[in-house]
Amino acid sequence: MSIKAFALIQLLSVTILYNHVHATSPIKTIVVVVMENRSFDHMLGWMKKLNPEINGVDGSESNPVSVSDPSSRKIKFGSGSHYVDPDPGHSFQAIREQVFGSNDTSMDPPPMNGFVQQAYSEDPSGNMSASVMNGFEPDKVPVYKSLVSEFAVFDRWFASVPSSTQPNRMFVHSGTSAGATSNNPISLAKGYPQRTIFDNLDDEEFSFGIYYQNIPAVLFYQSLRKLKYVFKFHSYGNSFKDHAKQGKLPAYTVIEQRYMDTLLEPASDDHPSHDVYQGQKFIKEVYETLRASPQWNETLLIITYDEHGGYFDHVPTPVRNVPSPDGIVGPDPFLFQFNRLGIRVPTIAVSPWIEKGTVVHGPNGSPFPSSEYEHSSIPATVKKLFNLSSPFLTKRDEWAGTFENILQIRKEPRTDCPETLPEPVKIRMGEANEKALLTEFQQELVQLAAVLKGDNMLTTFPKEISKGMTVIEGKRYMEDAMKRFLEAGRMALSMGANKEELVHMKTSLTGRRP
């Protein structure tokens, strides 16, 4: 065989391999946005009025004030949601009461009857129970109303674990919380050790990027603090629109919101007591940026919520035949075995490859008879769409339902996708209280910032680092920490440091406040 003929065969082999990798999916860019603390019924339940196929609400749903009292007064689910303050209960024990009505977790399916009772235990005035038993009219969340009508809504997507924010956020990109059932400040700040979809993508030379605003919560994964990933972090305000316009968004793009609620830059994460209006503006901006990008016809946008935030949902959460991701048992006193899911959350998929008005129910017994859609479905679907050869991250993403099928119905991308979405409706009266003390989630972000900056060595960690800090102070602190963290990483790389090492800041080079 001649050298020329051999070279031709080699070229054909490479072409065939490339086509094999990409032929099954038109999607080359996956964009993930994880919002905060709202249930499906609370945000999207009333969309059933627009499309009866959606498993939403009709107003007949209710919860008793006292589960154990057969004659207890019941509160019906309404459509009067607006600005919510304070934040309803969503700890592990609070969710157990909301789902089962008591500490007895043996009922299958669970009755989902303890939301009002649990809210009354936190607020006997009844204000909180009224909040958790109300949802938004579609016109109050017009951006979602449009996306649900134009693209796909999942009406059976659950949080991965019946717990709070960070354990569920961990599942989104790694299929496990590494045993966490609560927002443990020390573990979060030190970083969780599990392998992530980012690592798998990097190993197979797929690009990824994180577009952050205050500080990226994905840095709770320890591996993302490695020097080799320093250039994966981009300022949302400075880079996202430019990268999208230039067609340079990474294959796996994560967009993080503003978590700090300030006068000039209100929070956009939907976490109570933040204004849903700002969250709608944020989603509108992300969509319209992607829609105008030359990458649009190869893009999938996934919008989900980390957990339900204490709000009512009528669909029983799966409590049987859910596999533990890695065999790790949660800490005392609950010793949770990660064998049931959390409460249903809003999830929307957007792409020109999705038919209008698509409603996605369960995964129909695939890949396992008990499989469900939950946050681990994201890395599982990424693996399929990008044909990754690496093993599943855990038993959970191996089990989770995947949704590549909704992108495989059409032979060509749609050309009628709206270029703009409706203007959101202002909900909160008044302005952000930037002088308020930090919430639990915001404290965790400040504690993360302290580790990135090296300040955790300056005081008793972790409680003291954010003690007495206001929202505006916390915002400035974490943004300064992120700036210094990235600068230190770039400098270390320029000096020839090992790219597999973590970025380490020296306390002597930083101060507690910027």
Curated annotation (Swiss-Prot):
Pfam families: Phosphoesterase. GO terms for biological process: defense response to bacterium; gametophyte development; phospholipid catabolic process; root development. InterPro entries: Alkaline_phosphatase_core_sf, Phosphoesterase. Expressed in leaves, stems, flowers and siliques. One of its GO terms (cellular component) is Golgi apparatus. It comes from the Eukaryota. Keywords: Hydrolase, Secreted, Signal. Disulfide bonds: none annotated. Residues 1-23 form the signal peptide. The keyword Signal applies. GO terms for molecular function: phospholipase C activity. Its EC number is 3.1.-.-. It is found in: Secreted. Induction: Not induced by inorganic phosphate deprivation. Gene3D superfamilies: Alkaline Phosphatase, subunit A. PANTHER family: NON-SPECIFIC PHOSPHOLIPASE C2 (PTHR31956:SF26), NON-SPECIFIC PHOSPHOLIPASE C4-RELATED (PTHR31956). Belongs to the bacterial phospholipase C family. This is Non-specific phospholipase C2. It comes from Arabidopsis thaliana (Mouse-ear cress).
